[in-house]
């Protein structure tokens, strides 16, 4: 590592919590203990919770890329003739979060039975709608579709 001040940012996913048993008293998440680099302890580090649901996705800047890697934000648009209750089919995607028109719509995980996110009519607008996806596993899938039914494995 070159001399000087450096910044390392890590994202630790928290997919659940303990809801019973003695471990419920210590349900901590994140990094704990000493942090080392080549057996040298790193000091003056801090852990900050990231409120993903409150992320201002409308302010993100996107650049065209062939492979976003992971984790990665994706952005797209879709058109709605008449706003109605619908579902966003997320089957084939790994794990992530979805925003429609800048508002948090829900999360998905390939291991869950439910493979769709409900989009109430109130979240959609006639004409163009924006879709932002924060994908953690990036398996190469780049499309989602709307469905009039919930999708389950």
Residue ranges of model-derived segments:
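A cross-kingdom feature marking solvent-exposed beta-strand/loop segments within repeated
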Residues: 1-5, 85, 104-125
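Terminal leader/tail segments of proteins
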Residues: 87, 117-153
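Aromatic-lined ligand-binding clefts that engage carbohydrates, nucleic acids, or primary amines
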Residues: 8, 78-101, 108-109, 131-134
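Glycine/proline-rich low-complexity spacer/linker segments in large multi-domain proteins
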Residues: 13-43, 138-153
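Edge strands and adjacent loops of beta-rich recognition modules
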Residues: 49-74
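Solvent-exposed loop and beta-edge segments used for protein-protein assembly and interaction
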Residues: 2-4, 27, 68-72, 80-82, ...
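Short, well-structured beta-strand segments enriched in hydrophobic/aromatic residues
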Residues: 2-16, 127-135
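Surface-exposed beta-loop interaction hotspot
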Residues: 29-57, 79-80
């Amino acid at each position: 590592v070159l001399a000087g001040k450096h910044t390392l940012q890590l994202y630790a996913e928290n997919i659940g919590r303990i809801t019973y048993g003695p471990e419920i008293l210590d349900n901590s998440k994140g990094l704990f203990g000493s942090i080392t680099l080549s057996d040298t302890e790193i000091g003056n580090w801090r852990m900050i919770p990231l409120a993903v649901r409150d992320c201002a996705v409308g302010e993100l800047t996107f650049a065209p890329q062939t492979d976003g890697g992971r984790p990665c934000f994706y952005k797209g648009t879709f058109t709605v003739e008449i706003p109605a209750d619908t579902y966003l089919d997320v089957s084939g995607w790994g794990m992530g979060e979805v925003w429609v028109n800048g508002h948090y719509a829900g999360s998905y995980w390939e291991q869950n039975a439910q493979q769709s996110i409900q989009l109430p009519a109130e979240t959609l607008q006639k004409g163009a709608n924006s879709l932002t996806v924060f994908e953690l596993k990036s398996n190469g899938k780049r499309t989602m579709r709307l469905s009039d039914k919930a999708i389950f494995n």
